[in-house]
C-alpha cells in the first residue's frame, strides 16, 4: 500500500497526512511516559468524564510515576463543542500538546488557539476547570504548563498572619 503515498491530488494528500499523523502520534507516545509508564495500573489512569453521551465526549487523565499528568479529551460527534468545560486536577495554564485536527494530519486546525487558563469552579468533582473548543470528530491532549498558587495555601497562610495582627493590635 506504500504506492498510495505517491498518488497525486487529494487522494495522495490524504494518505500522506495519515502517514504524518501516525509518525507524530508514535513519537508523541514515546516522548510522554504518562501514556505508557503505568499502563497496567489504575494509578496511571483516571476518568474525568465517561458518561457524557449527550455530547458524545469523554475526558480522562494519564499519569506517570513522577505524577506528571496529561488530560485527554475526545469529541466523537460531528458537531463543534465550543465552551466545553471539564474539571482538571491542577489549577493553572493548560497547553494543547497534540490535536488530531492539526492541518498536518488533514485537519482544519480548529480548537483552542493558545493556552487555556483554569478557573476556580467546581466541575467533575474538582475545584478547578478548563473550558475548551473541541472540533468535531477529534481528540486533543493537554498538559498543565504553568501551575497557579493553591487557593487553600493562600487561606492557610492568611490565618497565621491574621492571628499575628490581632496580637499586635492588643
Regions found by a protein language model. Name each.
Residues 1-170:
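Carbohydrate-interacting/catalytic domains
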